[in-house]
Structures are given as C-alpha cells and as structure tokens.
Amino acid sequence: MRHIISVLMENEPGALSRVVGLFSQRGYNIESLTVAPTEDPTLSRLTVTTIGEDEVIEQITKQLNKLIDVVKLVDLTEGEHIERELMLIKIKATGAQRAEVKRTCDIFRGQVVDVTPAMYTVQLTGASDKLDAFIEAIGASAILEVVRSGVSGIARGERVLSV
C-alpha cells in the first residue's frame, strides 16, 4: 500500500542524507521525496512517499523517530489528507493534434505554459492519480519529457504537524 509520511526535522546539513540513508540501508524504496523549510526557519518538512505493508511502514516510522534530526512525524495516509503534485510535461503537438492536446489539457484543468510550432509544455497539479491519468490520456508516443515534483501533503481539518 502507498503511504505518505510527513516528517518535521531539524533544518541542518546532513539531516536529509541521514533520512535517505535509513531508507537505503534497509532496502526501502522512496517513490517521491520533497523537502522545504517551514514557517520556523530552524525546521524543514520532508514528505516521503513509499510503498509497503503496514508492518513495514510501522518499522520505517519507528526507525525515523530514532534519528536525532527528526522532531515529529505522521503517516498522512492514516487519516483524511490533501495531497498535491506538480507536473510539467512536453507534448508533441502538430496539426490536428494541437486541438486534441489542448482539449485534454482543459479537461484536466492543466495550463499551457509554453508553445512552439511542434509542441506544448503543460503544467498540471493534483493528486498523483490525476497526473497519471493525464499521461495515459495523452499517450506515450506524444510525450517528449515529463518532470514531476513529488507529493506534498497536509492533514485535513485541524490536525497540525508542529512542535
């Protein structure tokens, strides 16, 4: 099962390396990883997406909690949450394809951010499933390049990850 783990950690050199090292040493795969400073400049929020059975995820969270740099963490998938990902995608679009690509982009509420005579660059945000569906709708033969930010997530309601 896919899990999104949100980690509040010290904003110090080497902190990210220790978290990634833990995953690597234990043979856990990281599907996506985002990290940025929080409202408190001494802390960073790391959001890691990984796949595993509940027992494996429990083991990961226990090991993460043992790291000196980790202040607090939560598995967002245990409750209601909001997740978003940004994707930039270059799509071949010539002749009649241009209108079809634009229509598909509109259906998925994407934005065309760059246009050349032979292609569109589209920006799309949403849950990973939405981005995957857009890629499938466009078709692999039309895709020139894809860049994705990785998942960012936050708990719904009044639940807050803070010190």
Task: List the model feature ranges, each with a label.
Residues 1-45, 49-163:
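Long, contiguous binding/interaction regions
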